[in-house]
């Protein structure tokens, strides 16, 4: 069971990376999403630390959810897949980017430079997949039946910090965060519908 669960997560991660970075090869006429309000949001390079929490969070959190409530995991998985597909569709239809600031010298500044460099071309801004997935984690943490209260508190807190850090690291603009809200809501509705339809088949495959 555990091996199949890890396999599902590995396939999802590969699917996400392939679509996320692959779609950048086809983007033309990039639109600037930066607005005057974004200049009022401070740049804190040290917040790259909570920003990077996203990567282990999306790897470990689903496994915790599955052990607690398989249905919540199934609806989480379906929603996540839809978020990825819809996000990439948005990136292809309306490519977005903006000019990032020059990080200062020092440890956190150098760390920030690595993140900027890892973003490839600095595209795929709106809607923020970082934020929409965090909204999904927050929602799942609240509704997951039987989840330990401390796990709820920790995961929601980390997810909120990640969303805020997308702004203070200048990886995203306010528009990116706001457009992630309707993306999440639509994906969530469709994800629940798919989970209701394929939950039994999914459990049979996993072997729960």
Model-derived regions: residue spans:
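N-terminal transmembrane-helix/juxtamembrane module of multi-pass inner/ER membrane proteins
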Residues: 1-58, 103-104, 109-112, 207-208
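Alpha-helical transmembrane segments of integral membrane proteins
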Residues: 4-12, 74-82, 151-155, 175, ...
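Alpha-helical transmembrane segments of multipass membrane proteins
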Residues: 12-20, 58, 83-91, 162, ...
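Membrane-embedded alpha-helical segments of multi-pass membrane proteins
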Residues: 14, 53-57, 132-133, 178, ...
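Membrane-interface loops
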Residues: 23-38, 66-150, 192, 196-208
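Long, highly hydrophobic alpha-helical transmembrane signal-anchor segments
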Residues: 51-71
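Hydrophobic, membrane-inserted alpha-helices
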Residues: 57-61, 132-140, 157-164
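Interfacial helix-loop-helix junctions of multi-pass membrane proteins
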Residues: 125-126, 161-189
């Amino acid at each position: 069971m555990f091996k199949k669960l890890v396999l599902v997560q590995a396939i999802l991660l590969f699917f996400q990376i392939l679509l996320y970075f692959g779609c950048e090869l086809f983007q033309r006429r990039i639109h600037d999403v930066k607005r005057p309000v974004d200049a009022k949001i401070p740049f804190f390079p040290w917040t790259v630390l909570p920003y990077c929490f996203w990567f282990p969070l999306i790897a470990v959190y689903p496994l915790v959810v599955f052990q607690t409530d398989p249905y919540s995991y199934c609806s989480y998985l379906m929603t996540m897949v839809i978020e990825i597909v819809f996000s990439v569709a948005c990136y292809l239809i309306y490519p977005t980017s903006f000019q990032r600031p020059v990080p200062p010298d020092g440890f956190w500044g150098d760390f920030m430079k690595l993140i900027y460099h890892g973003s490839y071309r600095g595209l795929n801004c709106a809607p923020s997949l970082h934020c929409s997935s965090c909204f999904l984690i927050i929602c799942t943490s609240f509704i997951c039946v039987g989840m330990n209260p401390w796990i709820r508190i920790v995961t929601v807190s980390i997810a909120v910090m990640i969303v805020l850090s997308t702004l203070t690291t200048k990886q995203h603009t306010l528009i990116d965060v706001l457009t992630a809200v309707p993306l999440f809501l639509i994906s969530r509705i469709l994800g629940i519908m798919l989970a209701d339809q394929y939950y039994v088949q999914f459990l049979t495959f996993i072997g729960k």
